Structure formats: C-alpha cells, structure tokens
C-alpha cells in the first residue's frame, strides 16, 4: 500500500534521525554493491548528528521526506555551490520515488537561488536515481578511504545536471 510522504525542510530535531538513516543506508544497502571492508570504511567516515547542525548553520540546505508520523525516512543535503553531498533513504523506504522527489526539490531550490548546475558523487546504488532525475554520469571516480591501518579502494560516479 502507498504511504503518504511529505517533502519538507530540515528541522533541528531531525539531526539524530538523519544520522540513523545514513548509517542504516550504508550498512544495509551498501553490501548490495560494495565489499564488507568498503562498507565499513564508508560508514566510519560519517560523524553523526552534530555534523548536520553544523552544516545547516554553515549554509547547507537539507530537505527530508517524512512519513505520516512526520519522521524523516530519506533526505538530500545540498551545498550552496550546487553540490549534493548526501542522498540517503532508510532501507525500509526505498523504491518509493523519494530520491527522485528530493532531487526535484533540490533542483527547484537551486534554480531559485541562482545555481547553474547540480552535481554529486553517486554510488553504484544511487546512480540510477540521479539518472532518473535527469543527471548525466560524467566519469567514474576511483579512490581510497583510510580505514584502520589500511586504505580501502572504492569508487563512485561524477554526475551532474545543468539547471539553465
């Protein structure tokens, strides 16, 4: 059955839930495309709830998809230069079109604020959602994430969408 979702701006009391969504998305959905070492290194990079408050205070914009109880189940984080740094879905709320709606909301905001393009680094898992929203994959990015005493190789995709 279809649940009703509302896209709304971030509120301060969302921070803890967003940190949970991020951790769950990486650890639950990540293994479908990435190795255990890659997933562990990716998850360890993210410092938790406080960081959302700092980023919003610094001018980043977050839109959340909230369920009928107004609890966030997905979100997008947009920086003022058009860079989308986060696009994450709670594992129980994937394949509902939320990523597409969040990216459309980010694009509307970006146009209104004079940004000329949106761009992101998309995981293998997120790339189809970006492409459905009109982004083009420009290149594959191979890099490493330091984790414990080693560097874990991983990759993602540069994607972008002109807004003009």
Q: How would you describe each model-predicted region?
A:
Residues 110-123:
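Conserved GNAT acetyl-CoA-binding A-motif
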Residues 59, 83, 116, 153-155:
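Exposed loop/turn and edge beta-strand positions of beta-sandwich/beta-sheet ligand-binding modules
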Residues 119-121, 136-158:
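Conserved catalytic-core motifs of GNAT/GCN5-like acyltransferases
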Residues 130-131, 135:
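Conserved active-site tyrosine of GNAT-family acetyltransferases
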């Amino acid at each position: 059955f279809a649940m009703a979702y509302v896209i709304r701006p971030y509120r301060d009391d969302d921070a803890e839930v967003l940190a949970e969504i991020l951790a769950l998305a990486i650890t639950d959905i990540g293994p479908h495309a990435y190795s255990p070492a890659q997933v562990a290194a990716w998850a360890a990079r993210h410092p938790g709830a406080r960081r959302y408050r700092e980023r919003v205070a610094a001018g980043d914009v977050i839109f959340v998809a909230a369920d009928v109880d107004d609890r966030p189940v997905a979100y997008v984080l947009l920086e003022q230069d058009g860079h989308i740094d986060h696009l994450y879905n709670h594992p129980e709320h994937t394949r509902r079109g939320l990523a597409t709606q969040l990216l459309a909301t980010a694009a509307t905001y970006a146009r209104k604020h004079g940004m000329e393009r949106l761009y992101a680094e998309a995981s293998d898992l997120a790339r189809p959602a970006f492409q459905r929203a009109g982004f083009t994959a420009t290149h594959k990015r191979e890099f490493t994430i330091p984790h414990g005493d080693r560097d874990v190789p991983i990759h993602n995709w540069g994607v972008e969408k002109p807004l003009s």
